[in-house]
Amino acid sequence: MASDSPLRAHLRLKFAESSGITRMVERDHHGPLLVQKPLYPEGYEVCQAVVIHPPGGVVAGDELGIRVHVGPSAHAQITSPGATKWYKSKGRTARQHVYLHAEAGGVLEWMPQETIFFNNARVMLHHEVELEKDSVYMSCEILCFGRTAFGESFDSGEIKQHTSIRQEGKLVWFEKLRLEGGSKAMNGRLALAGRAVCATFIMSGKPLPAQAIDLVREEAVRIGGESGQVGITQLKSLLVARFLGDSSEVARHVMLCIWRAVRPITLGRPAIVPRSWNT
């Protein structure tokens, strides 16, 4: 386990497009939060960055900050080498603030692997997204409350999460979550409904055809419907999909199923699962 000494770590990335190639033109970091080198698993049009947190977990009092800027017509994909672990706390709160900005025509894919909250963890997560005209944002988030593989449940602790998405300055998505371990709210239908894993996929851009959504929903339910609950909703400018269950592995398959289906329609390119997800 990581040291009990609180850490402050910040990472700032900037991507720009030139002659059809997306490059990482700025990479600044302070503390143990970094990107080793840009990757191009599907050609030079898409730049992939794997964000690494060497300590391997976040302890009470730690503060992480990530800022990503995608320039006009650039395409960046941000992922992680493994699950992010938030360790138990004796009182202090660990924090993470993510700010993502895509300029006109830019594409930003936010695809970290699972987030695991250990029992007694106290965590505050801020996630802000700013999108300019004709930009596209896709995100996949898998939250695991307790280490279910070890028979651990989230009986104590507190998780707070604020998520906002703005398109051309207009707020199109806002979600505020506050969960106390072992509380009645965790069993409520408006929260986790007694489940230990919550996964969310969000995509901005033009609405998908109704037939395409029906096909995506059918396949997602086939994968996750027996062990959990799957829902997909097309809003005016956002597609939102959710999975509630008790298996992070099933949640991963459901999220990737949805991503594989909508990425070719929206971006005109197949979904290539980040290599780090397969290790």
Curated annotation (Swiss-Prot):
GO MF annotation terms: nickel cation binding
Classification via InterPro entries: UreD (IPR002669)
Pfam family name, one: UreD
Chaperone keyword on record: yes
Disulfide bond residue pairs: none
Source superkingdom: Bacteria
Chief location category: cytoplasm
Family: Belongs to the UreD family.
Function of the protein: Required for maturation of urease via the functional incorporation of the urease nickel metallocenter.
Quaternary structure (record): UreD, UreF and UreG form a complex that acts as a GTP-hydrolysis-dependent molecular chaperone, activating the urease apoprotein by helping to assemble the nickel containing metallocenter of UreC. The UreE protein probably delivers the nickel.
Protein name, entry field: Urease accessory protein UreD
Organism: Nitrosospira multiformis (strain ATCC 25196 / NCIMB 11849 / C 71)
